[in-house]
Amino acid sequence: MIAKYIIGYIATGIAFAAIDSIWLRNMYTRLYQPEIGELMMKGGFRMGPAVIFYVLYILGMMIFAVGPALQSGKWQTAALWGALLGFFCYMTYDLTNHATMKVWSTKVTLLDIAWGTFLTGSASAVGYWLTTMIMGRD
């Protein structure tokens, strides 16, 4: 049983990182740089906080979306609960920034919330699917 959750964590992490990297590579210069560029670090990002975010967020995806899907045997459980998790987490981040920062655009808020919803839902579903392909559905 624990092996299934370890595989699930790894599979979900790979799915999340792969999908998110496509978005970040394409939207960094199209969305974030033009809209909130003055808030961003020049030449990259801090690796430590990024790794901590990924490790803990994927754990949250396992607890709230992929784990329940592994118990129910339904990918739709992972997709729905993952999408809801993504919506609430990204909404909290974006609306807090929108409310407290001088430079934060409505465009970034809306697109980032939509992205977080899609990303977390789809990565949860893919993580569930990969796990069941590797470990079976018992």
Where on the chain are the PLM-derived regions?
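Juxtamembrane/disordered regions of integral membrane proteins
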Residues: 1-115, 119-138
